[in-house]
Amino acid sequence: MNRQFRAAARVLIRPMIPGLLVILLAAVSACSDDPDNPEQQVRDMISAGEEAVEARSIIGVLDFISDEYQDKDGRQKQEIKQLVAGYILRNKSIHMLTRMQHVALNDDETRADVILYVGMAGVPVASVDQLVFTRADLYRFDLSLVLEDGDWRVARGDWHPARLEDF
């Protein structure tokens, strides 16, 4: 029965987990070479977030999700916390390859919309060509970031499967 429960949980949760991790990776703050350039801050944050997810730092990642987070399915920060913790604990190794397609800041530069493509695998992935051989999961993420107390945080995230050609 325990095996059946775990199998059912994987079927239900697996499609959500990679998306949640990438949403969370986008929330991790980082210093920019040009602290006055919000777009560069967002790009640096994505890079630092990738490192936090690969380091499997649950607390490090979750600290940067907005307390006001809510996605289209009604999930809030607490549900994200549970899903991320479960995914990180079940995976001994997490490796990501990210490609940012688009960053758009609002007029007062306190909100940003990001389109991000992510390949997630259990082994290191250094190039798009390796995504095929590692059987990586490929996703497109549409993220809404908000500037809170000087740090960019994820306020909303939606995702769906991507194709290799998207990278």
Short names for language-model regions:
Residues 12-16, 148:
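Sensor of tandemly repeated, compositionally biased sequence architecture
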Residues 15-27:
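Bacterial N-terminal signal peptides
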Residues 30-58, 63-64:
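Short, low-complexity N-terminal intrinsically disordered segments enriched in polar/charged residues
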Residues 46, 83, 96-102, 127-129, ...:
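Short structured motifs
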Residues 62-107, 111-113, 117-120:
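Short solvent-exposed beta->alpha transition segments
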